[in-house]
Amino acid sequence: MNTYFEEDFGKFLWEIGNFIRDKGLQFDPGLYCATTVAVLSLKHTCSDVKTIIESFERDETRGAIMIYVDYYTELQVFAAKYGREVLEYGMKNMDLNEYCNWRKLGDPDNYQYLNNLILGLHHVQSGDLYIEYGCGRGNGIINAASKGITSYGVDINIQHVIVTEIKAFWKKIAITVECVNMDENGTCEYGATKSTVDTGFMRNNYNFDTLMENKYLQPYKAVIKKAGIRIWGQAIIAYQKNKTGRVIALTFPAALFNNSDKGIRKTLVNQGLIEGIIELPNGTINGTNVKPVVIIISKENYDGVKIMDATDLFKKTGRTVTIEPLQIENIIEMYDQCKDRCRMVSVSEIASCDYVLSANRYFEKNKIVEGIALKDICDIERGTSIRSGELKKMVSEEPTKYQYLMLQDIVDGKIVNQLPYLKEIDRKYSSAILKNEDIVISKLVPFKICLVHIDDEREILANGNLFRITVNKAKMNPIYVMLYLRSQQGQQELARYVNGAVMRAISIKDLKQVKIPRMEMEEQNKMAEKYKQFMVRLEKIDLERERILADISELL
């Protein structure tokens, strides 16, 4: 890449962007349309520019660019400041929208490398007909076409289609792009040999009824739910339309674990149609910190599903992930050969995990060989969610024996002293009332875990972001359980059951599955006694610290 050209082209884009806003015109696809006219103006007359625009295939593209011919002279002035060489370089080599996206979270080159990963997993070759459903602004199909692959793009957003056609014009690459809804019957019957579904990370920006009317989904109507993620239905449609029946779908983690999609996951796993799952790190895709997930659909995968954890295989700085070509090659090799961070998970093992396909369920850094599930030794309840208006009515200005515990009240593994007082606690909330030596654990990551110390007269009500764990003391010492959950191994065990793309959390159902290593009760009790001794020492240190701080405050 030419750094000098990039800097100048970036300055040019900011000027064009401000020009578009000042005119009250649409930024997308206006940025591409205005830039196209500006660059052409350096070499062609206004009349010639109109002729070139007429060569575009789509009426919508021609119309969108023609708007800016009215500003030919003004755009020519902008372009002349930077020169044809710089601007043509930018149009051929840079993604305009990404370059101007000041909120970007990742490396702009990640798009191309992610496309290369998908194409590499497809093993595209000469003679393939490749189609991308939800082609967006065309990065994927243009990348495929540049490798000599016949490429089709489909997107429901006409702005995306216009930008894709303009990009292909400047890169001198032949592609076909359609503005249609892949969910509808009779669309996209191209006879592709390889296809990708990348229809965005939104759950509900589509018509569920239209999707379910598709003829290819009729056998699956009973297991595809409206509350689920559409990628499963669309992947099936694409799979049925393919000549070879191989599809790669890009989605987000909820598709692998949410209860709404359990039925379709179970059906596809048992039919041998899910070949593999690859989880990539948060921040891989520009503009979102959501973790991308690759789902590979093909036939006759009766041995199980390849599941790969690639979340820590890329370089990450803060929220920015940088992908390098060698890393892409390594991921493809690991997946194809099912080695290192990729393993074949049997159908029976997936069934035992309730058809959750998240990688953290199947990769254990410190596997607990002899363990017992929390559900077998504990009573676990979620705290209560009380509306703010109702909670205000419950709060007491005067001290009472009733108090309320929130997430922020757990600091350094202890409950703070000054909890809000309540007038009383309705018995309908009894399951959320904490008892002495109960364990409290937060629902959200990072986990806050503490042991409750309370006399019999007081009652503390836990809120909805917390779980109450009451350990059967005949089976395990609650202090041992608490210490294990806080430990590195315990945190890794909890992490296996964490779900969520942005808000990482554990459900009560999954918390009950967390395993605790077995230990002789005598050893547990010894550990608990040592813990109590350490806590007494810490309390003395805290008191001394308070005295010292008080003395410091009196120095003046």
Task: Describe every region a protein language model picked out.
Residues 6, 28-31, 36-107:
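Long recognition/docking surfaces used for binding and targeting
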Residues 225-290, 294-296:
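Conserved Class I SAM-dependent methyltransferase catalytic core
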Residues 287-370:
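Flexible, glycine-/basic-rich loop-and-beta segments that form/coincide
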Residues 104-204, 252-253, 264, 270:
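Conserved S-adenosyl-L-methionine
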Residues 205-213, 391-426:
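DNA target-recognition patches
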Residues 295, 360, 459-467, 498-526, ...:
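A short glycine-rich beta-alpha junction/loop motif
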Residues 429-432, 436-486:
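A short beta-sheet element
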Residues 336-399, 411-414, 518-556:
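Non-catalytic DNA-recognition/assembly elements of restriction-modification systems
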